Amino acid sequence: NYGESGIVYPDGRLVQFTRAEADNIAEIGEAGVVMHDGTHVQFDRDMAAHHAGTPPQPMPERVTLDQSYGYSGIIMPDGNNRQFTAAESDNLVLVGPSGAVTADGKNVQFTDDGLPT
């Protein structure tokens, strides 16, 4: 939590401000601090959540799959790779062991080899 006299970090560390540092604080908001000297302190995700009193949300992770079709392309049965464009990759919402769901509403079913039908 960022206060007028110091900081309590999400990991429990405490920092006490000097009188000059405390006097330099103009405004403390949800996302950071504005100082009288014109500098800004931008909170990172964890500090902003800690300052707001809410627990941080877990970061989403892309799942790595042991198959020939993934978020970045396809490995063909003949060993050739087909790299997706950025637009094609961005269109993939979810890739699982049996198929993929695209942002434009298509469902792609995979064969036993993990290739689209």
UniProtKB/Swiss-Prot annotation:
Sequence repeat placement: 1-17, 26-43, 67-84, 93-110
A UniProt-annotated Pfam family: Cuticle_1
Lineage, highest ranks first: Eukaryota, Metazoa, Ecdysozoa, Arthropoda, Crustacea
Source organism of this protein record: Cancer pagurus
InterPro entries on file: Cuticle_1 (IPR012539)
Tissue-specific expression: Calcified shell.
UniProt keyword Cell division, yes or no: no
Name this polypeptide is given: Cuticle protein CP1246
Protein origin, superkingdom: Eukaryota
Sorted UniProt keywords: Cuticle, Repeat
Range of residues in the leader sequence: none
One MF annotation (Gene Ontology) recorded for this entry: structural constituent of cuticle
